[in-house]
Amino acid sequence: MPAEYNDHGISFAYPENWHLEENKIESGNLVIHLSSPGGAFWMVTINDRPIASSELAKTTLEAIRTEYDRVDHSPVKRVIGKYELSGYEINFFFLDLINTALILSFCVDGRTFCIYWQSDDRQLDICEDVFEAITYTLLDRLSK
C-alpha cells in the first residue's frame, strides 16, 4: 500500500518504506525529500514566486556541477499530462559509483516546481520507475 503526502496544496503517492522530510529553506521555498532504503532519493522544491523554470533547472545543475568533479549532462523535455517539464539528465561519479540524476522544472498557478531525483546505477532500474510514478501522481493531482 503506498503512503500519501497531502499538504501545501500538493499531493502524491510514494512507497510506504521511503522516508519523507519536509523543510522550508532560507529563500522560503518548500523542499519535500523522499529517500529510499537503498539511498536513492526524489525531491520537489516549490517556489511560491513565479520564476522561469528553465532558470531554476540551470541553477540546480550549476549547484551539482560545483559539488562533483565530472558531471555529464544533456537537456531533456518531457510532457506528462498537460504539463511540459524541462531540465537535465545528469551522470557523475560519487563513491566510485556512476550516479544518474534528473532535474525537471515547470510552473503551475504562479508557483515554480523543481523535481530532482538521483540514484546510483545499481538501483536505477528499480528506482527510476518509482521516481516516474511519484512524479506522475504529483502532476496528475495538480490537474484536479
What are the residue ranges of the model-derived segments?
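Secretory pathway targeting signatures of secreted, lumenal, and periplasmic proteins
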Residues: 2-62
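Structural motif
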Residues: 9, 111-112
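Surface-exposed amphipathic alpha-helical segments
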Residues: 18, 114-144
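Hydrophobic residues embedded in beta-strands of well-ordered beta-sheets
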Residues: 30, 112-113
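Loop/helix-junction capping segments adjacent to catalytic residues or to phosphate/diphosphate-binding pockets
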Residues: 54, 96, 124-125
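Signature of long, low-cysteine stretches enriched in small and polar/charged residues
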Residues: 60-110, 132
